[in-house]
Amino acid sequence: MKKKKTYGEVYALGQYISMSAPKARRVIDQIRGRSYEETLMLLALMPYRACDPILKLVNSAAANARHNMSFNEATLVISKAEVNEGTTVKKLKPRARGRSYPIRRPTCHIRIVLQDTSFDEFEEDFFSLKKDAWEKKIRTKI
């Protein structure tokens, strides 16, 4: 399946983060759709352990936007944020009398996508100009 090329979007991907997916989703649901600056404030104040790796990913995505695409951080918005389950690390905990109990350490993959809102305004202006020219051609033929 071919991926659709999107303009004005930058992402950061964190794989095999040692945390269960539902715990990470609890934080991700709070930041989805918010601006970059508002997200930084929210993540700094939330009391969850998942905030630290998510904050690193948001900063990494913003650095990608600044360096690779020359976007302004003030116009960035978190357009997509998703958490997928990763592999589960399985270990054995030794117990008394030669027994052992299994320990499962869940991991997750987090993807943060930032979108530049100034690009959307430019795109709307561009397509509105295109549409007007198209309508003029139709009117002249009639």
UniProtKB/Swiss-Prot annotation:
PROSITE patterns xref list: RIBOSOMAL_L22
Transmembrane segments annotated in the record for this chain: none
Keywords, ordered alphabetically: Chloroplast, Plastid, Ribonucleoprotein, Ribosomal protein, RNA-binding, rRNA-binding
GO cellular component: chloroplast; large ribosomal subunit
Stored InterPro entries: Ribosomal_uL22, Ribosomal_uL22_bac/chlpt-type, Ribosomal_uL22_bac/org-type, Ribosomal_uL22_CS, Ribosomal_uL22_sf
Subunit structure: Part of the 50S ribosomal subunit.
Protein family per UniProt: Belongs to the universal ribosomal protein uL22 family.
Protein name per its UniProtKB record: Large ribosomal subunit protein uL22c
